[in-house]
Design a protein with these regions (language model features):
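N-terminal beta-alpha lobe that positions the nucleotide/phosphoryl donor
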Residues: 1-298, 302-322, 328
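Short, charged beta-turn/beta-strand-edge "cap" motif at the junction between a beta-strand
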Residues: 13, 601-602, 610, 665-666, ...
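Structured, non-catalytic alpha/beta "coupling" segments that mediate domain-domain communication
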Residues: 97-104, 383, 393, 590-622
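Short amphipathic alpha-helical segments
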Residues: 194, 264-267, 430-436, 632
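Catalytic cores of soluble metabolic enzymes centered on carboxylation/carboxyl-transfer
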Residues: 323-575, 687-763
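Conserved nucleotide-binding/hydrolysis modules and their immediate coupling elements
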Residues: 568-571, 576-593, 599-602
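Structured functional modules or segments
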Residues: 629-720
Length: 763
């Protein structure tokens, strides 16, 4: 019995790996009793109801917190593997997947590693080494801190490495003068958007360098010139332990934010086929040169204007987007990883044989992979990563509970999710918790299908989500025309270009928020009244006014003075600045949400817990009504960890500039001062943060300059409740009588009806 031990790389990876290995197990042995899957899990993962825990045969609980305590801890991984008597360990991506110490330690205990050997990982997994080796193979490399350095073999001397590596901000400044701006600061051991910063000036370099250090502690750092107007193309390579290497076409992963992919697709359509062949051949040559074994990815930058390309890096592991390649080739990559670790040559793997057009998929005849033709791509696959990020705030990571997740499968659509209903995304997790793939004959058709699939996907909870933003990106003309670059999405974010639902205006959002708050308050007051009466205490007078609620809501820095009156359990009247604005009919849903009929449209509204305001989801779109801001307090916008202060204690902070840095889901982010004045540190670096926690107190320099929410003035859009449809063949007098009778009953029940004077007419 073989026992792989998948480690949650992020958890969505473990879910995918388990399913792929189970599929191979049944295809090969027609049973589910061959593989016994054991997973590591933290208490945070258990509380988050991580899906991979349910799929595994067993799990072993390890320490929570930073990945240094668990999934990046080589000693712990080996200890767990030995404890469960594992035959193999699947490392996924991230964490310890690119640490050569892991395969070395596992080999010492005769445990297979489903990845490359330590020597080949050393050779190409380190980004600095990979660039030097690429230069040595006459592969074009864009200018960087190690330009011109070459070696004869695959072993890179320490002094050569030192010449390419930067050990301080001062060394980075000297190298930047040679490389030129704009440039990238990179951690050699980084990946997945971690340990990388784009800078345009020396001042930005001085800020970005320590941020890269903090995201990937202990990693060597280098700089690289930024390639403009480029596409991010990558080649999937597979190599066995017998010297055979093949490429499985390429992928285009050019839609990125913070240098982390968000939409992937394949095969490559932006470059001519002859260019793609050169990329694939170069990837195979590099893998052969270093004696690579396992599954890996060779990445390139392709200039869409000139048609030139240059080497970027090698990822010596499976990547998040590998199902794109699986879809267009029919090759199960986690299963291939397992077979490579078992010593099986590529020509004896059924999926590889099918890909090379061999009629006998279970045969063992040799294949000349250098000359044998491959099957053409099986259509086009496009994928979108589902992340717990807030697109309205530059894709800031968020964490919290997930109350609802529904994914409707369509023909040609698949989805992998690391959590389900009653799950969540904790602060130490990766922000990605889902991946949706659409497969059709052409790129255009795949894009349409992915957009439709995202429209059918619903996620509701304490987290923010990128689903609607993803769908808007796919529908943009630049993307549909295949004319975007790696800088496209970051440019949209910088320009605050957000998808706009023209039917969901600010006034409609305020009305939905007002109805939800009034509905919630009604039941809160009702509970207090019942509790008081149960205890034999007369309720206070303010508790008994269940049908009228006065409050303010702030949206987009505008403050709305609202008065909401209930005419019945299902009818709400809203006044803005004491002027009638809305009549809304409400249906309470089984999951606690409301269906609000407003201005001829039905909106599904859910409220989510928040310490700093009212958060609602309107048709899946998160909308936030913050509490009034206190200019003397600077607070945490979400969960995370305080890393360091950028402004000293009892020093002056300038509004609009960073005053500290926090770590949110493995990403370093600045907090921006909301007032100008002398700040007092209230927390020590390393402190855990929750939403609303006060980080600094501020002695405001000029109270008159404090930005406050402006009261709403002007004319508010008028909304009416839904109108009856269909045929009512009743006497008009009888209808009027029934309506009046219903209104009287509601008034006697304690409800109010602002429309009494117009509703009740003589007949």
């Amino acid at each position: 019995m073989s026992t792989p031990c998948p480690l949650p790389p992020p958890p969505v990876g473990a879910v995918k790996a388990i399913r792929s290995l189970r599929l191979w197990e049944y295809e090969t042995f027609r049973t589910h009793d061959v593989l016994h899957v054991v997973c590591m899990a933290t208490e945070d993962d258990l509380k988050a109801n991580a899906e991979y825990i349910r799929l595994a045969d067993e799990f072993i609980v390890v320490e929570s917190g930073s990945n240094r305590n668990n999934y990046a801890n080589v000693d712990l991984i080996v200890k767990v593997a030995r404890r469960c008597e594992a035959d193999a360990v699947w490392p996924g991506w991230g964490h310890a997947s690119e640490n050569p110490k892991l395969p070395t330690a596992l080999a010492y205990h005769d445990i297979a590693f489903l990845g490359p050997s330590a020597s080949s990982m050393d050779a190409v997994g380190d980004k600095i080494c990979a660039n030097i080796l690429a230069q040595s193979c006459d592969v074009d490399v864009i200018p960087w801190s190690g330009s011109g350095l070459t070696v004869e073999g695959i072993t890179i001397p320490e002094d050569t490495l030192r010449m390419a590596t930067l050990r301080s901000v001062e060394e980075a400044e000297i190298s930047a003068q040679k490389v030129g701006f704009p440039l990238m600061i990179k951690a050699s051991e980084g990946g997945g958007g971690k340990g990388i910063r784009m800078v345009n000036t020396m001042d930005e370099l001085r800020v970005g360098y320590p941020q890269v250090q903090a995201e990937v502690p202990g990693s060597p750092i280098f700089i690289q010139q930024l390639s403009t107007n480029a596409r991010h193309l990558e080649v999937q390579v597979v190599a066995d332990q017998h010297g055979n290497v093949v490429s499985l076409y390429g992928r285009d992963c050019s839609v990125q934010r913070r240098h982390q992919k968000i939409i992937e697709e394949g095969p490559v359509t932006v470059a001519p086929r002859e260019t793609c062949v050169k990329l694939e051949q170069g990837a195979v040559r590099l893998a052969k040169k270093v004696g690579y074994s396992g599954v890996g990815t060779v990445e390139y930058l392709y200039n869409i204007t000139t048609g030139e390309y240059s080497f970027l890096e090698v990822n010596p592991r499976l990547q998040v987007e590998h199902p794109v390649t699986e879809t267009i080739t029919g090759v199960n990559l986690p299963a291939v990883q397992l077979q490579i670790a078992m010593g099986i040559p590529l020509h004896k793997m059924p999926h590889i044989r099918k890909f090379y057009g061999q009629l006998d998929a279970n045969g063992v005849s040799p294949i000349d992979f250098d000359t044998a033709p491959q099957n053409p791509p099986l259509g086009h696959c496009m994928a979108g990563r589902i992340t717990a990020e807030n697109p309205d705030e530059g894709f800031k990571p968020t964490s919290g509970a997930i109350h609802e997740l529904h994914f409707r499968s369509l023909p040609g659509v698949t989805g992998n999710f690391s959590v389900g209903v009653s799950g969540g995304v904790h602060q130490f997790a990766d922000s990605q918790f889902g991946h949706v793939f659409a497969h059709k004959s052409t790129r255009e058709e795949a894009g349409v299908l992915l957009s439709q699939a995202l429209g059918e996907l619903g996620v509701r909870g304490e987290i923010h989500c990128n689903i609607k933003y993803l769908r808007a990106l796919i529908e943009k003309e630049v993307f549909r025309n295949d004319a975007h670059s790696t800088a496209w999405l970051d440019g949209l974010i910088a320009a605050k270009d957000k998808p706009v639902d023209l039917s969901l205006t600010a006034h409609a959002i305020v009305m939905c928020g007002a109805v939800m708050r009034a509905h919630t308050r009604h039941f809160e007051l009702e509970e207090r009244v019942v509790d008081a009466l149960t205890r034999g205490v007369p309720p206070e007078a303010w508790m008994t006014n269940l049908s009228e609620h006065k409050f303010e809501l702030i949206y987009d820095d505008v403050k709305y003075a609202l008065r909401v009156t209930q005419g019945s359990p299902t009818l709400f009247y809203v006044r803005v600045n004491n002027v009638a604005a809305c009549e809304a009919e409400v249906l309470t849903l089984a999951n606690g949400g409301l269906k609000v009929f407003l201005g001829g449209r039905a909106r599904v509204v859910h409220a989510e817990p928040s310490k700093v305001g009212l958060k609602v989801h309107i048709d899946g779109r998160p909308c936030f009504f913050p509490d009034d801001r206190d200019p003397t307090r600077m607070t945490a916008p979400g969960t995370g960890k305080l890393l360091r202060y950028l402004v000293a204690d009892n020093a002056r902070a300038q509004e609009g500039t960073p005053y500290c840095e926090i770590e949110v889901m493995k990403t370093v982010m600045p907090l921006i001062a909301t007032s100008t004045g002398i700040i007092t540190h209230l927390l020590q670096p390393g402190a855990s943060l929750e939403t609303g926690d006060e980080v600094c107190a501020v002695q405001v320099e000029d109270p008159s300059s404090v930005r406050v929410s402006e009261p709403f003035v002007g004319e508010f859009t008028s909304f009416q409740a839904r109108k009856l449809t269909g045929s009512l063949k009743l006497d008009s007098a009888l209808v009027t009588h029934n309506l009046n009778s219903a209104g009287i009953i509601q008034i006697l029940a304690g409800y109010d009806s602002p429309g009494t004077t117009t509703r009740f007419r003589r007949f």
